[in-house]
Amino acid sequence: MGYEDEFPESLELFKRAERVMPGGVSSPVRRFDPYPFYVERAEGSRLYTVDGHVLIDYCLAFGPLILGHAHPEVVEAVVERVREGFHYGTPTLPELKLAEKVVELVPNVEKVRLVNTGTEATMSAIRLARAYTGREKIVKFEGCYHGAHDAVLVRAGSGASELGAPDSPGIPESVAENTLVCPFNDVEAFVETVERFDEEIGAVIVEPVLGNAGCVPPDEEFLKVLREYCDGTERLLIFDEVITGFRLELGGAQEYYGIDADLVCLGKILGGGLPIGAFGGPEEYMSRVAPEGKVYQAGTFNGNPVSATAGLVTLEVLERERPYDELSSKAERLASALEDGLEDRGIEGVVNRVESMFQVYFGIEEVRDYADVNSADHDAFKRFHRELLEHGVWIAASNYEAWFLSIAHTETDLERTEEAFEEALDRLTG
């Protein structure tokens, strides 16, 4: 049976969606050929589609659901909070508690501003860095996706890469000119760039792990060089930890790699599955944010008590259970099984992993930057993705996204996934 036969109800819903939504979806990365399936509900490690299929989920909404879907403690807290109202437009105890927890857990953060998305977090952090340094240019890295705002949608990753349009129409050249782009992990290119534009640079922004090009870890010296440059020139180093925050360690990539950023951007896990974002850092910088300072940032739904409640409970569970060794072990097992499967069949490819996030790249032996990701065999990945889906395993449809593990993934899930690897790889070589 073909995909259309397996997902007929999803097809009818997608036809309706195409009539009223651009491309039939609310975010480009959710679209894949011939059309996306629709999910009715989710629990633990499983998605339940409108067509009656049950899928083991390693996309996890692109990373937020480190506890799995509908974790009982999160659900109970959110339901209780919703009974008290959804949003008030006033300060609330949940936002205060979440802010206190972020300051407690995340290195080098003394104050934090809660926003609604990762995009808002990076946009605001860049504005703050420019205001603090008095310089307009920023340095970013190829494939690093920092949200959908003009300053950073230049040679970005995630859906921008998959669409082949990382430089979106509608971005003024005058804006793009203030964004300097270097290859990820290329220290020499970074040094050349900052030497050329040094007096104009206000900030360096980076995903510590390139998670919007799959999973590309930093070379040992790469992040250190960025930190040393910013230390020596009084520029601000911004870590975009929307993906890595609370994922690699409780204190995120700063704790994991032992390198402090000046400003850190958070999202995904911070909201426990509900919309949220945040940026924070030392009081020296954050005191510039309005109303304490003059750097303006505001939002009707900033600090939403329902999102803050979900996020707080999620962080409390992570703090209590400290599941990071377990999560890493699960991911290592699957990554190793996939590597063995490639080797046994003589399939060229590589699996990159950092703790509980990983990705496979076909047709290439090493992936350490965005150019390598672009050189991988994406047609092979799409076939592999489709085969896994037919065997009940869901991963993001794009090679530019990561796979994620959660505490909800069971031994049975891992065994079934390993079996699906075998079947899918056999089909690739058959």
Swiss-Prot record:
GO MF annotation: an example: glutamate-1-semialdehyde 2,1-aminomutase activity
GO terms for cellular component: cytoplasm
Pathways involved: Porphyrin-containing compound metabolism; protoporphyrin-IX biosynthesis; 5-aminolevulinate from L-glutamyl-tRNA(Glu): step 2/2
Superkingdom of origin: Archaea
CDD domains, A to Z: OAT_like
GO BP terms: protoporphyrinogen IX biosynthetic process
Keywords from the UniProt entry: Cytoplasm, Isomerase, Porphyrin biosynthesis, Pyridoxal phosphate
Enzyme Commission number(s) from the entry: 5.4.3.8
Cofactor(s), names only, from the UniProt record: pyridoxal 5'-phosphate
UniProt-recorded name of the protein: Glutamate-1-semialdehyde 2,1-aminomutase
